[in-house]
């Protein structure tokens, strides 16, 4: 049975991809990061997300594979991506088909704004 977790920027499936189709699996998780290309992803930042995903999956080993547990992993990854954005390790894709700034408005450093807003 195919289980999934879907957030704005993270999709997790209990499936393998074969010939562009999801094939349900009880032993494989497939991660799709930022399917709408809302962000510009430096390779290093994307690899950080993959490593965080691996760590979250490992920390849940031995737990039942349920939609609830997948949603927890997805929510934790979503928070991790927000943290990367706030640290400036990735940025919004201004050529994205939708500009909704789902993780907050972009912030630019400017001498006049030093200390004028909370991080």
Curated annotation (Swiss-Prot):
The keyword Metal-binding belongs to this UniProt entry's keyword annotation: no
GO molecular function: oxidoreductase activity, acting on NAD(P)H, quinone or similar compound as acceptor; quinone binding
Membrane topology, as annotated: Peripheral membrane protein
Enzyme class: translocase
Keyword annotations of the record: Membrane, NAD, NADP, Plastoquinone, Quinone, Thylakoid, Translocase, Transport
Catalysed reactions, semicolon-separated: a plastoquinone + NADH + (n+1) H(+)(in) = a plastoquinol + NAD(+) + n H(+)(out); a plastoquinone + NADPH + (n+1) H(+)(in) = a plastoquinol + NADP(+) + n H(+)(out)
EC number: 7.1.1.-
Complexes and interactors: NDH-1 can be composed of about 15 different subunits; different subcomplexes with different compositions have been identified which probably have different functions.
Similarity comment: Belongs to the complex I NdhM subunit family.
HAMAP family the record matches: NDH1_NDH1M
Protein name, per record: NAD(P)H-quinone oxidoreductase subunit M
Organism of provenance: Picosynechococcus sp. (strain ATCC 27264 / PCC 7002 / PR-6) (Agmenellum quadruplicatum)
